[in-house]
A protein has these predicted regions:
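Charged, compositionally biased N-terminal leader segments and the immediate start
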Residues: 1-34
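C-terminal functional extensions of proteins
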Residues: 157, 171-217
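A short, well-structured juxtamembrane/interface segment
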Residues: 54-69
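ADP-ribose/adenylate-binding Rossmann-like module
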Residues: 161-171
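Internal catalytic-core helix/loop-beta-alpha segment
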Residues: 14, 115-149
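Short glycine/serine/threonine-rich phosphate/pyrophosphate-binding segments
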Residues: 83-86, 142-148, 170-174, 196-200
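Buried hydrophobic positions in well-ordered alpha/beta secondary-structure cores of metabolic enzymes
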Residues: 79, 163-165, 203
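Long, charge-dense
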Residues: 92-131
Length: 217
């Protein structure tokens, strides 16, 4: 068998396993506790960017509380359909949870136009009406993170179990992350401009796999 054939017929699970071996080798000594390390490694796996080993900031009980809540059936609120699409809904549903995303709803767009704000901000207000424990996964829109910060500060929303705040970009991105880090809420935040939908989904999936004891690393 040629080298090309060997590459073509490598099984997805084998590729993933080898990828995590490479990440472990290149990451080296990191000083992270085992569960936090799994989250960091899954983000690196999704992005091929080792900068996240330094830029990801975890509040004291972020991973522990996130895993426990998902295991108990917490649902996930995503700021975009891309984040929602990347989350392993099969594993989430096995615990009784689901993914909510409101940004594409017609009435959300209409209300945003009427109020002169963004669909992302209105989406967070819609999420505030949901019952039960929630994990927020914000990977694209800093306006969603800003709206969530306001809702938490105004006590207009039950305190989220966990906020994954990893929007990407240049405008209000750093500021929105710093505000969430100052709130009395467990959080996982990518400091700086980097982040994205892929990062948000990877973090949620890492927590789901930890909750299900799925050794995908």
């Amino acid at each position: 068998m040629s080298n090309t054939e060997q590459l073509e017929y490598a099984l997805p699970r084998d590729i993933e396993k080898r990828s995590f071996q490479i990440i472990e080798e290149e990451l080296g000594s990191h000083g992270l506790d085992p569960q936090t390390a799994q989250v960091v490694k899954r983000v690196i796996h999704a992005t091929a960017d080792f900068d996240f080993a330094k830029s990801l900031h975890f509040s004291n009980h972020a991973v522990q509380d996130g895993v426990a809540a998902l295991k108990d059936g917490a649902s996930v609120v995503a700021d975009t359909t891309m984040v929602a699409a990347g989350i392993n809904k099969r594993v989430l549903a096995s615990f009784g949870g689901s993914v909510h995303v409101f940004v594409s709803d017609a009435d959300v767009a209409q209300e945003a136009r009427e109020r002169g704000t963004t669909r992302s901000a209105i989406s967070m207000e819609r999420a505030a009406r949901l019952k039960g424990p929630l994990v927020f996964a914000i990977g694209n829109a800093p306006t969603a993170l800003l709206a969530l910060h306001r809702l938490i500060g105004d006590r207009a929303i039950p305190t989220p179990v966990l906020v994954v705040g990893v929007p990407v970009g240049f405008v209000n991105v750093v500021e929105s992350k710093e505000l969430i880090m100052g709130d009395d809420v467990e959080h996982i935040v990518s400091r700086g401009r980097k982040g994205g939908s892929t990062v948000a989904a990877a973090i949620v999936n890492a927590l789901l796999y930890l909750a299900s004891d799925d050794r995908r690393w």
